Amino acid sequence: MPPTPEVGLPLWLLAELTYRCPLQCPYCSNPLDFAAQGQELSTEQWFKVMAEAREMGAAQIGFSGGEPLVRQDLAQLIAEARRLGYYTNLITSGIGLTEARIADFKKAGLDHIQISFQASDEQVNNLLAGSKKAFAQKLEMARAVKAHGYPMVLNFVTHRHNIDKIDRIIELCIALEADFVELATCQFYGWAHLNRLGLLPTRAQLERAERITNEYRDKLKAEGNPCKLIFVTPDYYEERPKACMNGWGNLFLTITPDGTALPCHGARQLPVQFPNVRDHDLHHIWYESFGFNRFRGYEWMREPCRSCDEKEKDFGGCRCQAFMLTGDASNADPVCAKSTDHGIILKAREEAETAQLAIEQMTFRNDRNSRVIARG
């Protein structure tokens, strides 16, 4: 067994400001029972979190949700993050964004805005978002972000209902003069895991989409267009797991709306007691808490991970995925072909070939559905 690696610094702080959101995306990574979570942190409590994380080495902060724009103190939080020396990111649907708020955020020192789209087609986008005005608002705000001097960074979550239109998605991004485009195939956590049958593309769909993306990359390069296309494949079509979050509690720190501290944004579902910033400072949470030490190093590993010569590269894969698919977070990530549970992934691929679940049949992420799930 190699020596336990030194604990890294929490360089990347994800501030999940709220679970409130005007949209109802069926692939949202928020917890299914978000409606039953506790009271949101106050402005002053977030200031304390940001200051403590910065003292520990955090360099970049992402403001997300839910929809972070519903927080009326967002400009204050951005300004304080800037004062502390963070590189600041706003991760938003664009719903609730206005020219005036963009100007306020610019004045507060915001460095980066990423706007998410559900599809290139207005009808599909609005259906997935649960809002008839979502698409038009997103287009308007994407242009406004660019007009205020920000790079245009767009995120399209792709899945079986929109991935066959990847060419239209890319054409829309080119028309908008986007600088960076993330074509991120759905990752199956939270609501996406619940709706997997309606979201997981087939292998043929993925291969076609990646081929078309590569063709557009070549075309953009030949034309001297600086637009960068980033294509992200789902774990379910890999044979080896990802080094999730660069290792458990090693780089990435999430603070949820109620102050729960997590080593990744999906960890809340695990049967692990995670600390809260209302009760402990971040130094204690990061270095001493049980939750953040639970899957550090290699001692927790079972076979085949324990004796695997790749464990220092992938850390056994994703603990949340292992828990969701096998019921035990200490098991190998079933994505790995060496896992005795890899058949779960193979079965999911097979089911994707014949799945018939329509968009309208999926369970949408909203308060009503969340309350039903929370009641069990």
Curated annotation (Swiss-Prot):
It catalyses: [PQQ precursor protein] + S-adenosyl-L-methionine = E-Y cross-linked-[PQQ precursor protein] + 5'-deoxyadenosine + L-methionine + H(+). InterPro entries: 4Fe4S-binding_SPASM_dom, Aldolase_TIM, Elp3/MiaA/NifB-like_rSAM, MoaA_NifB_PqqE_Fe-S-bd_CS, PQQ_synth_PqqE_bac, PqqE-like, Radical_SAM_PqqE_MftC-like, rSAM. [4Fe-4S] cluster binds at C21, C25, C28. Its cofactor is [4Fe-4S] cluster. One of its GO terms (molecular function) is oxidoreductase activity. Belongs to the radical SAM superfamily. PqqE family. This is PqqA peptide cyclase. The keyword Transit peptide does not apply. Pathway: Cofactor biosynthesis; pyrroloquinoline quinone biosynthesis. Residues 7-222 form the Radical SAM core domain. Its EC number is 1.21.98.4. Gene3D superfamilies: Aldolase class I. It comes from Pseudomonas putida (strain ATCC 47054 / DSM 6125 / CFBP 8728 / NCIMB 11950 / KT2440).
